[in-house]
Amino acid sequence: MSFLSKLSQIRKSTTASKAQVQDPLPKKNDEEYSLLPKNYIRDEDPAVKRLKELRRQELLKNGALAKKSGVKRKRGTSSGSEKKKIERNDDDEGGLGIRFKRSIGASHAPLKPVVRKKPEPIKKMSFEELMKQAENNEKQPPKVKSSEPVTKERPHFNKPGFKSSKRPQKKASPGATLRGVSSGGNSIKSSDSPKPVKLNLPTNGFAQPNRRLKEKLESRKQKSRYQDDYDEEDNDMDDFIEDDEDEGYHSKSKHSNGPGYDRDEIWAMFNRGKKRSEYDYDELEDDDMEANEMEILEEEEMARKMARLEDKREEAWLKKHEEEKRRRKKGIR
């Protein structure tokens, strides 16, 4: 026998054994388990008979009425089923259809359902309809809004324990009332005549000097003008009149008309022999700590010169140092 034939025999033997094991259980008959005898007849109670007859009569009466109200019941059931479907849909949507809101004061009041209105669906329009609508909108004149802002009075709350702030009420002046009356009469004229358009032109964006500097320059100009006029008048009288304001005149009259001491010498004693004239300066002639282009260039040139000099000094020192090393080496050899 071949190997395949042996396998087929083994399979057949296993299926037959399984069929023998899985035998159906015998069905249980109700008659075998009944304790009463087969020929037993149960006697009915007269009260039970009466109740059965009354029940049968009621059923007959209700049957005649049921035929008439059958159509109405069908209609009612259809409407009730629709309501149930709507409620189920609302529950499925997550309760978006009906929401309950509670008022502030009524904590124990029953909840009132607030129906939320669904937005209307947007109508789909073709391209031609949209173009027509745009043309109609162009033909219609634009609505001009009033430029005067509407001022709303803010609500004022009176709190207990706080002083009531008295706000000054603006009284209409008689001039304003007259203007209002006159403007009412001339409103037609103003509407006809177009108002001139005012353009905000850009101002000159160039840099301007500081305010203090400007004032100093103007004061200098004024002083120079007065001084020039005064010098012209004095030039005619210089030949035969000695000026009292001249420095030479003051130096001559120091010892004669002065207080008996020289202030410049005293000032030099306390300032290490320096003259007082070296420190005389005008406040207006003082620098403003602002360097010009020429000053910057001069400083750069000076810095370059100093750097070159330092480089030359370093090179000379290095050369000397190397020469000294060579001499020492030669002397050792």
UniProtKB/Swiss-Prot annotation:
SMART domains cross-referenced by the UniProt entry: SPT2
- Localization, UniProt: Nucleus
Taken from the record, one Pfam family name reads SPT2
Q: Where is the composition biased (Acidic residues)?
A: 229-247
- Where is there biased composition of kind Basic and acidic residues? 117-141, 215-228, 312-325
Modified residues annotated as N-acetylserine in this record: S2
Example of a GO MF term: DNA binding
Coarse class of the primary localization is: nucleus
Biological processes annotated in GO? chromatin organization; heterochromatin formation; negative regulation of transcription by RNA polymerase II; regulation of DNA-templated transcription; transcription elongation-coupled chromatin remodeling
Renumbered to this chain, the Polar residues biased-composition regions fall at 1-20
Listed GO CC annotations: cytosol; nucleus
Positions of the region Important for interaction with histones?
Answer: 259-333
InterPro entries registered for this protein in UniProt: Chromatin_SPT2 (IPR013256)
Q: Which residues carry this modification: Phosphoserine?
A: S126
Q: Which UniProt keywords apply?
A: Acetylation, Activator, Coiled coil, DNA-binding, Nucleus, Phosphoprotein, Repressor, Transcription, Transcription regulation
Biased composition range(s): Low complexity: 180-193
The text of the family note is: Belongs to the SPT2 family.
Q: Domains: what does the record tell us?
A: The acidic C-terminal domain mediates interaction with histone H3/H4 complexes.
Q: What does this protein do?
A: Histone chaperone that stabilizes pre-existing histone tetramers and regulates replication-independent histone exchange on chromatin. Required for normal chromatin refolding in the coding region of transcribed genes, and for the suppression of spurious transcription. Global regulatory protein that plays positive as well as negative regulatory roles in transcription.
Miscellaneous remark of the record: Present with 1240 molecules/cell in log phase SD medium.
- Listed name of the protein: Protein SPT2
Which species does the entry assign this protein to? Answer: Saccharomyces cerevisiae (strain ATCC 204508 / S288c)
The lineage is:
Eukaryota, Fungi, Dikarya, Ascomycota, Saccharomycotina
- Please name the gene that encodes this protein: SPT2
